[in-house]
Amino acid sequence: MKRIAALFLALVMALSLVACGGSSNSGGSSSGGSSNQLTINIWDSNQQKGLQQIADEWSKTSGVSAKIEVVDWDNYWTLLEAGASGGEMPDVFWTHSNTVQLYMDNDVLLKLNDYIANDPAIDLSNYYEGIVNLYTRSDGNVYALPKDHDTIALLYNKALFDQYGVAYPTSDWTWDDMYEAAKTITEGSNGDVYGMAMNTSNNQDGWYNLVYDYGAEIINDAHNGTTIGSAEGKAGMEMVRKLLTVGAPQSVVAETGTDSLFMSAKTAMITQGSWMINAFYTAEHHDDYAWALLPYADVNGNGKCDSGERYSAYNGLGWAASAATKNPDAAYSLISYFCSKEGQLRQSELGVTMGGMKGVSEAFANAFPGMDVSPFIEAESYDLFFRPYTRKTTVWEDALQQTGGFLDPWQNPSDAALMATACDNAQKIIENAIAAE
């Protein structure tokens, strides 16, 4: 138990502040549950209402109540660390690529193999392969079922584009087109409005996508190397640098946040994940907002988007249960319902998120009347990469955000040499972190 506690303390201290799941409310206790009640923890308040509705539908047939509690991202992991050290854990909860490798290695999660083998509702071949692989240990043991998947799109403010005479983004946009549009808006407003904003600590919905568009990888498919320091990686990061020169300074982003800047009409464009749609759909000025495909990198120089030039990151949360839950059968039954075709379709229909099961997300595009969210679905007709991870993802992710990583070019984007040097440093940071795992 001391070994587990030490591992999880190190993990929590290293955790990134980036979460795949937007706003959250603080608070929410958890308990070990009882034979007729399950406690569920998540970190995204945007999803609570829809997921509780699905859980209530399960409760009507199971006779077991299930209460969803929202815990903010930081406290979420502190809570689970305490549970792993001998305290109480929620019965059912979300897992994430940042942390799940250590959870699986330390017997904190309920092993699901026997349940899956006897469950006609679950066939792992029906889910996105990257998500299944994430929650399957190297010995074949499965510790979570795919809850959802997400993609990234470009969000823009039509009113600001109109005000500054800039044409709306289209599927033909390159990253250079985005740069020129952002530059026009920033300069046209004398800096009162930023053409774009990127939170550089939010890698999944931001700069990771450009690295892949230009032909490099943050982590390779074998999870044992990177090409961030290659010519292709440097080209992608050079484009990131250019965008930052016409966007909101990172000091402003750190203070206000890209979402708040956008909702207050202080920036005209951001890139954002599908898990955040509802926050913008319910915002005061949502009629001004529209989504578009992420731009592409015209690496081949032929004026069209070729294979490998437009990527979207995708990730997927997993539904897991505590190995110490007092009612493992009910916990799995609930997870199975969430992840069954019925539950996955309900999740899409209610606009919670797109499904972790393939072929169930079309209804998601119709869940937001008056707002076209089809770019998130359309992104899958191009290229996807699974959110990069290794056994100790947060070690190198954290280091990339520090001095010696990308901190200097983030803060001083006008200096191209700083970015090139940071890419070389990043290559070493990731390689050394993997070697130490």
Where are the predicted features?
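Conserved N-terminal structural module of periplasmic/extracytoplasmic solute-binding proteins
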Residues: 4-6, 17-108, 117-124, 168, ...
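Extracytoplasmic/periplasmic substrate-recognition and gating elements
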Residues: 56, 60-61, 164, 242-248, ...
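Short helices/loops that flank or line small-molecule/ion binding pockets
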Residues: 77-89, 160-161, 179-184, 256-270, ...
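A structural signal for short loop-to-beta-strand junctions that line the ligand-binding cleft
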Residues: 82-83, 90-91, 121-160, 303-312, ...
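Paired acidic/hydrophobic, glycine-rich loop segments that form the ligand-binding mouth/hinge
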Residues: 91-94, 268-272, 290
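Hinge/lid segment of periplasmic solute-binding proteins
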Residues: 97-151, 290-293, 368-369
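Glycine-centered hinge/linker elements that transmit conformational signals in sensory
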Residues: 181-184, 222-252
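Long, aromatic- and glycine/proline-rich binding clefts that accommodate carbohydrate-like moieties
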Residues: 304-305, 349-405, 437
